[in-house]
Amino acid sequence: MSEMKWAIITGADGGMGTEITRAVAKAGYRIIMACYHPQKAEVVRERLSKETGNPDLEVMAIDLSSMQSVVAFASQILERNLPISLLMNNAGTMETGFHTTSEGFERTVSVNYMGPYLLTRKLIPLMVRGARIVNMVSCTYAIGKLDFPDFFHRGKTGTFWRIPVYSNTKLALLLFTFELSEQLREKGISVNAADPGIVSTDIITMHKWFDPLTDIFFRPFIRKPKKGASTAISLLLDEKEAGVTGQLYVNNHRKNLSDKYTNHVQKEQLWEITERALASWLK
């Protein structure tokens, strides 16, 4: 397999992560499975390697809620000087309560936004021309709001509400996608976002975030991980998506967003504040 075909996939052992890893493995990439639970991921790695006939799958530990862990992970990749063709920021969480990380950030914000932001920024020097970055967002970006500085430390002023906080992180990740795509356009690196729809993943099945009435409303629309992952897989691998950048895709199609999002009034401000918040780890 080509030395130039390296892919990094966060949350590669989860529902959608497994589907994405399977597709990328079948396409012949050497894969770093960046996972929070290495032992669990090792079982998935072994199974996928046998299924796809691709022996070049490797598990590496990462805790996206810890910026120090993200830096340590990125440092290992940088030391190996791996030419990265694909970066899939797939991992995510929806905390059921308010949790502050050891670095002082709200945990949902760290895992869903700050960790992926930092990881991506650290790995850009290794990305080859034509590389693709895909960020997994959510339809909930539409109800997200960015209140600074509470966004980083509390997520929402006052009582912690998990769905609004989760939505805020997905809006932030979408705006990061748009801003980064502009900065990397001349380097020939594409940056896009994938909305998987409402998918049956650990966020739903383990955290039980919806009440019975919400369950009744959403259950008919909940997708299997394979279907939810299809849009991200298309953005990563389809030749017709080569060169496409700064877009949000839903159901394997480009979504036409209004200026409210593509030129969001807080897009540049979010970038600047995030850079300051992560300054000590971006060095």
What kind of feature is each model-predicted range?
Residues D13-G14, H37:
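Conserved glycine-rich cofactor-binding loop
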Residues G17-T18:
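N-terminal Rossmann-fold NAD(P) dinucleotide-binding loop
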Residues A27-V43:
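Conserved glycine-rich Rossmann-like NAD(P)H-binding loop of the short-chain dehydrogenase/reductase
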Residues P38, M60-S75, S102:
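The beta1-alpha1 cofactor-binding region of Rossmann-like NAD(H)/NADP(H)-dependent oxidoreductases
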Residues A72-E79, T96, S102-S110:
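Active-site Tyr-X3-Lys motif and surrounding loop/helix of classical short-chain dehydrogenase/reductase
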Residues G92-T100, E106, R132-K187, D195-F210, ...:
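Catalytic loop of short-chain dehydrogenase/reductase
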Residues T169, A193, I216-K255, H264-E268, ...:
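C-terminal helical subdomain
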